[in-house]
Amino acid sequence: MPDISLKVLSNEIKISIQELIKELSIIGITKTEDNYINVLEKNILLKHLESKKKYSLDTLVLQRKTRSTLRISTVGGKNKSVQVEVRKKRAYVKNNKFENESFLNEKKVIKHSMQKTSSLKNKEKKYIKNIEKIELNKSDSRSLNTKKENKLKISNKDEQNKKFNQHRESNSFDLNHKKRIKENKDIRISHKEEKQDYHLTTFLHARQAEDENDREVEIDKRNHGRILKNYRQKKNNKNFHNGRYNKEEIRTFNRNKKNSKQKNKPILLQQVFQKPESIINRDVIISNTITVSDLANKMAIKSSEVIKNMMNMGIIGTINHVLDQDTAQLIAEEMGHKVIVHRENALEELIMKDRDTGNDVSAIRAPVVTIMGHVDHGKTSLLDYIRSTKTAFYEAGGITQNIGAYHVKTDLGSITFLDTPGHSAFTAMRSRGVQITDIVILVVAADDGVMPQTIEAIQHAKEANVPVIVAINKIDKTDSDIDKVRNDLMKYNILSEEWGGENIFVSVSAKTGKGINKLLNVILLQAEMLELKAVTTGMAEGIVVESFLDKGRGPIATVLVKKGQLKKGDVILCGFEYGRIKSLRDASGNEVFSAGPSIPVEVLGLSKVPFSGDVVTVVRDEKKAREVASYRKEKSREKKLSNQNRINLENMFDDINKNNVSELKIILKSDIQGSLEAISGALLKLSTEEVKIKIIGLGIGGITETDASLALASNAIILGFNVRADTSAKKIINSEHLDLRYYSVIYDLLDEVKAAMTGLLSPEYKENIIGLAEVRNTFKSPKFGLIAGCMVTEGVIKRSNPIHILRNNIVIYEGELESLRRFKEDVNEIRNGLECGIGIKNYNDIRVGDIIEVFEVREMKRIL
């Protein structure tokens, strides 16, 4: 049969060409609309369509389950029950009368046509063979005309054969059609019978499954019997003496004996372990550090294999050896695994990369100048004169206790000033001020000279590699000595330009204003030499100079912008805190919408009060900023806990002696972050070996009810620095008589804490000798035992006082006077030069020549 086009086939099967092409593609035959299909491809397509029609919408699919329980004996002799479920699926097709008839007719027509084509092909082949034989027998002398005649004859015969076949096909088609009608009737009858016998068939399937299960059980029983029979035969056979086999069989027999109750129960399930043929390469995720055992677990191999590989690479370690990221990566890659390096701060790196850094065009910025020096040397007064304000007048105790950031516009140019405290407790503040500054102005009083905090300021400036300008203040005083200041500073490598050094010295008076303009000129000249520049566009970066909690506005941070533009509405990430900027205020308290480089501003909108010195970064996504902040907080907490739990010999001995140490528990509240850091640091330095300062709570803002409750529970004192307690806290403090103290000057706070620590010190006892008596004779008393007849040689002997007995100037006994008599009369004391009888409690070994030393114990107050 010749090839058929897809259009003809679609008409025959009654399927659209598109669906036909789709079905052909499913079975792996790619065709287009104009293509032809051969007989083999047609047969495959028809089989596919027939199987697809089996599970049509009129198909009923039923599942049958047969359950059985098996008992399996384990290694320990115990039996384990296993549920076995056999599932069987049956499909029942609804017989659609017209569709089935048409489909069967089509199918039979196709079969009939296939049979005809095959018979015709066979006849043609035979006919061609006969012609070839005839032609071979004929001689070569025949002409071409005879060949043409033969060919004409052959063609005539072909036409006759075709006519004959067509007539034959029409007759056979009628017969086949009648047969198909009969077959369809038989199928309908059988389908009805299947529907009637639905319950019967399902029952038969269930019975069949049970029979199969019973057969398996019987086979297992037979096998079990054979094993026992073979064992008995081997046991009786004297020639069989292989020890290894005997032991193994005895072991199996004993096991069977133990489980004799269940020996008839079959074992159908068996677990088989197959060893992997090749090494499986895995994706190994490695963080910053990993132990050898964890690395082995991730690669799904034994730890010994990893250690072997490490030794080959020249790394010696145990199973608990901690590997760094690079080493672990080398080992894993050496063993053929793919390494995925996990960075814990990946989100932080991502958020920092996704920032608009501006056009990278730098512009000249104002210098950041830090004023440093000893306390009361006139730092704030000098700044007040420059700013034309009176800050020092309003400050408690006349001393600065926080970093003040101010932006001053002068006729010569703009300068940002940072005023730092000079007290020794504010070391951290001063060092932080130097880290963010460009120039340091060292203020030294002409009448006072170089002081401890002056030296400390010089050290901070040198560490930060910042140029120092020396301002010699208070030159208006009569006792000022400028040359003495210059000579003192020379010891610390601060030399004036006049003396061949690098530092500029300016004599000023904060009171009269003398030399102030010269100082400003020098600052701007130094800034010009430094060529201070910063990018003025893009997302801002800065540093927290100071932070505090405002009762009405919430957490507030004073931020000095380093580069970019800090705008209202920006999302900022600041240490452990984050937030969206709600408000920006300058040093004068005026609200601004943006701030550029070297401009200090107050930022409102952070989640909590940040730490001074934290870096402020503007980011795009607030959600990611929150995640980074919480991650930083968690890492800091983990680090703190790991340091606390670190055990060594020193800590162990400290814990043993801990009971002998007194603790002064303190809850500290301050107005700003810088003061809080300074006070807590100074308090912890006051701790001694006998009295420890323990700060159980510290924070920024007023004293709350929570602070009062914590003080009550932990028996602590509450210290408030420039803050007050609220109403609810006052109620608890008054009702429970808690110790609450307010301070505005750091000196007073430290002095009172020292006094409280002195009260906690264990008292010191001193022995004061009040009299000496020499033993001249001894005699016995029925009431007191041995009595010493003595002469008082020095001081006064008092009754019931503690005594020492000395023999050859060595203390041999320490006790108490029990009896003191003179001329048979009890007395309370005997003075120098008189004789007396002394009875000593629980001691009878008194000899002539011993000296009795009488003393009294006095309690001495200790000072820190």
From Swiss-Prot:
Q: Which Pfam families match?
A: EF-G_D2, GTP_EFTU, GTP_EFTU_D2, IF-2, IF2_assoc, IF2_N
A single MF term (Gene Ontology): translation initiation factor activity
Alphabetical list of PROSITE patterns matching this protein: G_TR_2, IF2
- InterPro entries (UniProt xref): DNA-bd_dom_put_sf, EF-G-like_DII, EFTu-like_2, IF2_assoc_dom_bac, IF2_II, IF2_N, P-loop_NTPase, Small_GTP-bd
Region of interest called G4, as start-end residue ranges on this chain: 473-476
Compartments in which it is found: Cytoplasm
Q: Name one GO cellular component term.
A: cytosol
Region described as G1 = 373-380
The protein's UniProt keywords, in alphabetical order, are:
Cytoplasm, GTP-binding, Initiation factor, Nucleotide-binding, Protein biosynthesis
* Annotated stretches, region: G5: 509-511
Q: Which PANTHER family does the record cross-reference, listed alphabetically?
A: TR-TYPE G DOMAIN-CONTAINING PROTEIN, TRANSLATION INITIATION FACTOR IF-2-RELATED
The UniProt entry's sequence similarity note says: Belongs to the TRAFAC class translation factor GTPase superfamily. Classic translation factor GTPase family. IF-2 subfamily.
User: What is the annotated role of this protein in its UniProt record?
Assistant: One of the essential components for the initiation of protein synthesis. Protects formylmethionyl-tRNA from spontaneous hydrolysis and promotes its binding to the 30S ribosomal subunits. Also involved in the hydrolysis of GTP during the formation of the 70S ribosomal complex.
Which protein is depicted?
Answer: Translation initiation factor IF-2
Organism expressing this protein natively:
Buchnera aphidicola subsp. Acyrthosiphon pisum (strain APS)
